[in-house]
Amino acid sequence: EEDAYVVSFKGTPRSFAFKDIKIQKPKGRLLKKLRFINDDDEYAIKVIDKNGIELIAIGIGNPFYATYEHIGYEDREFMGGPVSSANIEIAIPLEFKPELFIISKRDNLGKFKDFQEIVLP
């Protein structure tokens, strides 16, 4: 249970806004999501240092698709639906010194396209 930078964003499918960065113990749920990009990720956040070096790229799935986990919906083929905005948190090890976040989204061909840069204030 190590402290980490926990970075919060408010996002819509087309635009992310920086909310805050704290040093704290990430919640278990957040640590489970701290992973490299995989095929299920629609969105990713690249963490860049002051020298322009990519420290880590974190897959965040699709934060704009809410899944239903209610009793009575288990037999549905699609358990969820789109949402217009989401709060997004990522955890970054303290030895990294983030300066810039690059938000990218997968295009129709499955390639990630950067669509926004957010510099730490």
Segments predicted by a language model, with ranges:
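Extracellular glycoprotein-like low-complexity segments
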Residues: E1-P121
